Amino acid sequence: MSDNEQEESSQVVLKEDKTFVTFFQSLVSSNEDTDTIRLFDRKGYYSIHGEDAVFVAMMHFKSKKSLKYWSISDPNPKKKIKIDNDGSLTTTASSSQQQQQELGLAVLTIRQGYEFENIVKELLDEKKKIEIWSMKPNSKQQWELIKKGSPGNTQMFEDVLLNGNCEGSVMMALKVTREKGSIVFGISFGDATFKTIGVSQFMDNDNLSNLSSFIMQMSVKECLLCCDQKNYDYQKVKEKLSDAGIPFTELPKSDFSSKNAEQDLTRLLGSVKNNLPDIEQEHAIQSASCLIKHLDLLSNPNYFGKFKLEKYDLDRYMKLDSSSFKGLHIIDLKDSSVSAAAGGGGAGGASSSSNKDQSLYNLLNQCNTPMGSRLLLQWVKQPLLNAEEIEARLNFVEAFYNDLELRQSLRSNDLKKIGDLDRLSKKLHGQKATLEDCVNLYGIVTRLPVVLQSLNNHSSIHQELIKVNFIESLESIISDFAKFCAMVEKTIDLDLANDKHEYVIRSSFDETLRGIQLKKDQISNKIERFRVDIADDLNLDEAKVKLHYSEKDMFLLRISRKDEVAIRDKKKYIVHATAKDGVRFATREIDTLNEAYKKWSAEYLDKQDGLAKRTLQIAASFVPLIEDLSSLIATLDVFVTLSHVSSIAPIPFIRPEIIPLGSDENGAGTVIIGGRHPCVEIQDNVNFIANDIDLTRGQSQFQIITGPNMGGKSTFIRQVGLIVLMAQIGCFVPAQKATIAVVDCILSRVGAGDSQLRGVSTFMAEMLETSYILKVATKNSLIIIDELGRGTSTYDGFGLAWGIAEYICNQIGGFCLFATHFHELTILSDLLPMVKNLHVSASTQNNTFTLLYKVEQGPCDQSFGIHVAILANFPSQVIENAKQKAKELESFESNTLKQNHNKFLEEFKEINFNSNDVEKSLSLVNSLLNKYSIDIN
């Protein structure tokens, strides 16, 4: 803590609460789980204490100034809570010197509502567990736990999390075993917020690539792990979860019992036996049993028959690991070590990290509805492998792309007015809905005919497709909602809801309510007469004195700020507020009438309680229909959005031609004409240079890209990866023409950076990621490698780059883009027929250096390092010294060093590199270096 912060904080010392302090310290000492943050409900606000308070203050407020301290008499003098110099709280032995540093027990208070909701969301994002404690009824000193949650179990915080655009909280139960020498994962995954549960059982390789892809694509937030300390694979799973930042809990094997799993699943799914997972997925069924138990799903009867079964088919989606998500900037991840902008290059350098369109998802997500945004995120994380499914999506996008009038109608009017149906259904299902929610749902349903009319007006070659998938479904849903609409119109006062935002049962529905409403009407009529009289008293036109109603203040009069002079210095007029829309005021008589109106309103709510509950119960029976509508609207929204984004790009996107997975053996492949990086081209002051790529099987499937730094190599290889991914999502792509061969995974090794928190150097990080690629990639994969070998000596780096490139060509046979600063690698094209060279061009005419960002055929014929240094405004003396030293080295190389270098390369080509044994490969290279006395230092 800084001196200023400590001085400010130490001035705020609260009265000691010995009983609570004793309870809190015993609570902390009895639980060693440092990932749990405890909040105490103080009836109006929440308090957080100790190290929890410091953590939340820094997380949310980015400062410790909001902390206060209890000056405490510690009941345990052997332990004291003190503030360290860095502001953290620690427990230490007592001493007079330490006591002088003590401020006491840190206390942080947070308001209910928006502030509390944001902090809960932030804590869950930080992978923290949360506990809410409250005072026991009729007690002033005893506390009880009333709510708890974790990143993967947010059932008790549904109302908080659904008050925004969340993607759900997926908990995963996992069991790992070996069968016939292969790793087998039995997984069950569930999201209690969105009432989904699923199972998946699959084999994996030693690098756990399938598990990595599953974790990323299913947005797993937390894991329940079947403990098996003797299993070597189990230790690797723990490391994989830790690397992915997934908190996990180790549980005994007894928790993974399939004894009652089938029965439990049937109760949750409400389905017959035939719809349950295959019995062959025994390990997945066992994991499902664990998941159901630890989410305590069977304790809530409201869950019975309400869950939906999800299936994760490993063969349906493209594999994407965290490196690809980060390297290609597909979505925004919390890992800030990776630049959020597309790398330097094609548009004249790296983009600003503050650009809101820095990720592909941010670029595409112009959805009108929260449901659409959630579905789009799922699609971006799970690109398809089946060409027919991809073509089906492209047909929908094309239909809306070619119909501007329909697209604008849906985006500007129809979809924009549809609220969060997921949130509405969860509130109704969880019995937390209000009459206002019923009115909101009614408003959405009554707008559906407008959406239907817009769709009916569409005419194109895809007209039948729109009819079968949207029009007919929407007609059925509208028909099924007819009874709901009739109930709302009969029971809820819609006029009052629209005029005054009061959501009550119609007074005509009950004699008592009719009498109370009469009293309220009499009061409002009196206030209206006051309004007319006051306008006359103020010498203002009657239309200028308006009646303003709010649930908080009831009735107030409002005049413009310009007319405020009319009530100035007149004591009988009481100003309540001044806002942009004018000055709100009243008289004592109006204030008295407001108190009476508030009293009758409260009595009305009390008398209607039973009728309101019955209305909400009936509304809850429509939850399955709401979920169907939500799914339909989300899908429609995504297709309309993808067509919209494709049409408004600086140069409109085009529909790609799709080649099915594995059908490019006859020489076909991915060919992109005039390709562009979708996230870079939209940036301000960017004139993007489009480039071509031809990845043809057996002819040009391995492309080596050389050229100057900042010339566009990184942007070029990333844009190819993004275009392929966009096509497999079912989106149009930024190009003049594109033929995309479906790939089973995109594997990337881009950027050079240390992983200091893991104790991993730049070079080791490169080797680990590259080793993973070599073991996971197949002939149908797209591999993207950017500047491999920068983290070690020149010869080691070059040797490994050569060996890795050769292995990819000869052993894997996949598509690869290999950007490198090792120009010597370009001779691979003379040795291997599938290798082709590309380079990013630059001009050095008239002693000037200009980056052209154009990708051209052939290798780069010179180095531009000094030219780039000039662009970076290096001092002229440094530039001149560099030029002189470069000439000396070139002259030196023309003699013995150059001869040795050439001999080294000749023998180096003959080495058969083993990707599984990096040390052996390095040993072979070092022996050659020693043989020819080549110094790498």
Swiss-Prot record:
ATP binds at G707, P708, N709, M710, G711, G712, K713, S714. It is found in: Nucleus. Signal peptide: none annotated. GO terms for molecular function: ATP binding; ATP-dependent DNA damage sensor activity; mismatched DNA binding. Keywords: ATP-binding, Cell cycle, DNA damage, DNA repair, DNA-binding, Nucleotide-binding, Nucleus. PROSITE patterns: DNA_MISMATCH_REPAIR_2. Residues 635-709 are annotated as: Interaction with exo1. GO terms for cellular component: MutSalpha complex; MutSbeta complex; nucleus. Heterodimer consisting of msh2-msh6 (MutS alpha) or msh2-msh3 (MutS beta). Both heterodimers form a ternary complex with MutL alpha (mlh1-pms1). Interacts with exo1. This is DNA mismatch repair protein Msh2. It comes from Dictyostelium discoideum. The gene is msh2.
